[in-house]
């Protein structure tokens, strides 16, 4: 599983996760923030996911976990505006 490889430090596996989910995350974030800011907020979500990947326990699907991170980053963006 890609997530397990990332948890073991495999950078290429994380790149594959980004490629796999970047459009879904961008689409999700675009519901909350102006289109011009979507790439920045999506990048922040992926950075947060990378830094916190060790806390992913697999109790849910990876995208469910990433979805929550992306929504939280969008909300943080909105509060800051």
Enumerate the language-model features and the residues they cover.
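Short acidic-aromatic loop segments in the C-terminal HATPase_c
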Residues: 50
